[in-house]
Swiss-Prot record:
Protein localization: Nucleus
A Gene Ontology cellular-component term: nucleus
Stated name of the protein: Zinc finger protein 1 homolog
Signal peptide from the UniProt entry: none
Amino acid sequence: MNKSQGSVSFTDVTVDFTQEEWEQLDPSQRILYMDVMLENYSNLLSVEVWKADDQMERDHRNPDEQARQFLILKNQTPIEERGDLFGRALNLNTDFVSLRQVPYKYDLYEKTLKYNSDLLNSNRSYAGKQTDECNEFGKALLYLKQEKTHGGVEYSEYNKGGKALSHKAAIFKHQKIKNLVQPFICTYCDKAFSFKSLLISHKRIHTGEKPYECNVCKKTFSHKANLIKHQRIHTGEKPFECPECGKAFTHQSNLIVHQRAHMEKKPYECSECGKTFAQKFELTTHQRIHTGERPYECNECAKTFFKKSNLIIHQKIHTGEKRYECSECGKSFIQNSQLIIHMRTHTGEKPYECTECGKTFSQRSTLRLHLRIHTGEKPYECSECGKAFSRKSRLSVHQRVHIGEKP
């Protein structure tokens, strides 16, 4: 096939993000994007994608002059007139530039270029203008400075002022790109990162540094993103809404878990009782009911718990921390859920209704107790005489009869 036909530009294989969309990507998503874009760029270099400009067959100007003429922006402004917009020679050792940020478009300014795999061989010299390499890949220019030129040929590269420099245009071998992807190494654990900022963030795992503080409760975080998520507890913001039922959540992860309920996806099954769960950690926590394991222990009173969250709540008994305050009466509570229930004493709200008799209650737990009147359930049995009760408090009162205490 003629190489001037069926040409491929980088635009055909890239994905664009707006600045707002880019900022919303988490570090792992940005790394994935970077890897894919570099992979595509490398692949384009390994196939015949060169596009010739027939008009340049008749153009015999100096290559540098031609470069200044044909390295143009989409609005046809010569690159020299754009100054700092071009930026700098990009160095993959220190940075990665999103392939959408610099909207350059440039065409080949030489005669028809015969693709040759030897272009990727840095040990081979090339003669004359046929070796001037200017690959058309659309949206970004990636350059790598080389210490030496080949066969006296001058290769064009542009700095902030748009001046031509005597360096070879960036033609990367696939492996070389891979080596440059993660140049930042953690001195504690040797883990490698693509960005210096990710390395700095990672090191906080080792140092324990938590530079981001909540201005409401003074809790600190190692990452700014975690602080932003935490602050939704105070603001009540729930930006993630279920399209099925409209229920909103503070975190996207909670929405994903919730949506599994609609899809009835509960892939994790308990081998003891057959109960299924949407997440593996839920199964792990549930299995402690069967094993009796309580791995979370209070360092104040040695009480143990199935869940870490229950331990955290319990520890507030010892610290006396009650950060949730009622705006009506000033009473404070350890948990936000306790405050919500308390507020119903002021509003009179009773959202839990008995399906048998229509009686309403302010708390779900009270409704459960009430339902035992209709079902006749009495789960609390006296070990001495076998008498059963619907409430634990009534069993406790009854047991005093056996030990001789006055009720």
